[in-house]
């Protein structure tokens, strides 16, 4: 994914405000062997790019003054109530150095899972992304979570996922966290419990 930026020579609160008033967003690219570089980007193009999932979890071709660098989006600051991007940070990446990136999960076959189709349950997304470690070339845009065989009451854990080659998940605390589950809606579960309580054993 290509991102076009321009070098920025002035900095400070006043300069950033004037930049935003002219339809630009201030930013910085850092990391690697090169010095940090102040940049500016077209606000509208950046605004639309931020709406794309891939912009947050893939290696970007960041072009600055005609020179392209591989980079990751690391942070961005939004105005508290206006549709305005105040600042954006990019980090250079090296082909030989592993990176840590949060990758979104795509839940597959939810409608056809037995627990949904036959058991009338609901799929619960316990987590929606995972932090992964990999080389830039191995970074996936997303990780598929296939819930197609799940029943009501079943929980899918990290070890149940098929990870792309070269990708490992970075866990914090729980080494095998729950990813998804299928359960009955609250009303249905209560009704089922009520029916069970109302039953009397046969004489």
UniProtKB/Swiss-Prot annotation:
Gene3D superfamilies documented for this protein: Ribosomal protein L25, beta domain, Ribosomal Protein L25, Chain P
Similarity comment text for this entry: Belongs to the bacterial ribosomal protein bL25 family. CTC subfamily.
InterPro entries (alphabetical): Rbsml_bL25/Gln-tRNA_synth_N, Ribosomal_bL25/Gln-tRNA_synth, Ribosomal_bL25_b-dom, Ribosomal_bL25_C, Ribosomal_bL25_long, Ribosomal_bL25_short, Ribosomal_L25_dom, Ribosomal_uL5_bac-type
Keywords per UniProt: Ribonucleoprotein, Ribosomal protein, RNA-binding, rRNA-binding
The organism of origin for this protein: Cupriavidus pinatubonensis (strain JMP 134 / LMG 1197)
Function: This is one of the proteins that binds to the 5S RNA in the ribosome where it forms part of the central protuberance.
Subunit record text: Part of the 50S ribosomal subunit; part of the 5S rRNA/L5/L18/L25 subcomplex. Contacts the 5S rRNA. Binds to the 5S rRNA independently of L5 and L18.
The protein's name: Large ribosomal subunit protein bL25
């Amino acid at each position: 994914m290509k991102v076009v930026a321009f070098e920025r020579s002035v900095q400070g609160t006043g300069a950033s405000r004037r930049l935003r008033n002219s339809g630009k967003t201030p930013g910085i690219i850092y990391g690697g062997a090169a010095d940090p570089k102040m940049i500016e980007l077209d606000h509208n193009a950046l605004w639309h790019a931020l709406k794309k999932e891939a912009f947050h979890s893939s290696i970007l071709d960041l072009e600055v003054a005609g020179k392209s660098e591989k980079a990751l989006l690391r942070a961005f600051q939004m105005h508290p109530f206006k549709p305005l991007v105040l600042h954006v940070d990019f980090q250079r990446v090296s082909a030989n150095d592993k990176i840590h990136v949060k990758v979104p999960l795509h839940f597959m076959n939810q409608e056809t899972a037995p627990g949904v189709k036959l058991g009338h349950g609901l799929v619960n997304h316990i987590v929606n992304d995972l932090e992964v470690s990999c080389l830039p070339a191995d970074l996936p845009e997303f990780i598929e979570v296939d819930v197609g065989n799940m029943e009501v009451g079943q929980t899918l854990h990290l070890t149940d996922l098929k990870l792309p080659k070269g990708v490992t998940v970075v866990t914090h605390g729980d080494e095998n966290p729950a990813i998804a589950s299928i359960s009955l809606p609250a009303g249905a579960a209560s009704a089922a419990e009520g029916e069970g309580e109302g039953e009397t054993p046969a004489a």
